[in-house]
Each structure stands twice: as structure tokens, then as C-alpha cells.
């Protein structure tokens, strides 16, 4: 799984609980989008989290 270029977000781990409270491991995937942004003055296609895009931490090219 990819990682956010800006915030470093990646998938997180936890338990899925049944009605009987039995635990089985599961993952939550980060909402990552592949976008073109300027990196060192050049356009580059990277994975960026939706939160970073919405908050304006990056500017699309």
C-alpha cells in the first residue's frame, strides 16, 4: 500500500469485532489519491491523502 507524500499517512491496523466480540485482525486503508504536484520545481505524480488535498497543503499542477 502507498503512503501519503505530504502527511505520511498509511494503512492502520486494528480488530474487527463480531457480535460475540471475537477479534480478527483487519486494516483501514488511507484515502489516497494519485495527483501531479510540483516537487523541487518539477511536476511529479505522487500519492497524496484526500485530507491534504482538501486542506490546501498541496497544489495540483
Swiss-Prot record:
Biological process terms in GO annotation: translation
Domain of life of the source: Bacteria
GO molecular function: structural constituent of ribosome
Keyword Ribonucleoprotein applies: yes
Keyword tRNA processing: no
Pfam families from the UniProt entry: Ribosomal_L28 (PF00830)
Coiled-coil features, chain-numbered ranges: none
GO cellular component, one term: ribosome
InterPro entries in UniProt: Bacterial_rp_bL28 (IPR050096), Ribosomal_bL28 (IPR026569), Ribosomal_bL28/bL31-like_sf (IPR034704), Ribosomal_bL28_bact-type (IPR001383), Ribosomal_bL28_sf (IPR037147)
Keyword annotations of the record: Ribonucleoprotein, Ribosomal protein
Family under the similarity heading: Belongs to the bacterial ribosomal protein bL28 family.
Record-given protein name: Large ribosomal subunit protein bL28
Organism whose genome encodes this protein: Geobacillus kaustophilus (strain HTA426)
